[in-house]
Amino acid sequence: LECHNQQSSQAPTTKTCSGETNCYKKWWSDHRGTIIERGCGCPKVKPGVNLNCCRTDRCNN
């Protein structure tokens, strides 16, 4: 599985996630604006953090 792993609005980068079945994108807002984090897996998130998990290559941009 290949997942995007760039932060927020940086240029897209990807990494190969061996053994993973999900990519994730999570986002929240703070004083800097909207923060977006992407990577492998499907983490648990705190209340107030939005999470989208998906199962295809590069699905989490």
UniProtKB/Swiss-Prot annotation:
Disulfide bonds join C3-C23, C17-C40, C42-C53, C54-C59. It comes from Naja kaouthia (Monocled cobra). CDD domains: TFP_snake_toxin (cd00206). Pfam families: Toxin_cobra-type. GO terms for cellular component: extracellular region. The record marks T56 as: May be the main cause for the toxicity difference between this toxin and cobrotoxin-b. This is Cobrotoxin-c. Produces peripheral paralysis by blocking neuromuscular transmission at the postsynaptic site. Binds to the nicotinic acetylcholine receptor. It inhibits muscle contraction with an IC(50) of 0.20 ug/ml. Keywords: Disulfide bond, Ion channel impairing toxin, Neurotoxin, Postsynaptic neurotoxin, Secreted, Toxin. Transmembrane segments: none annotated.
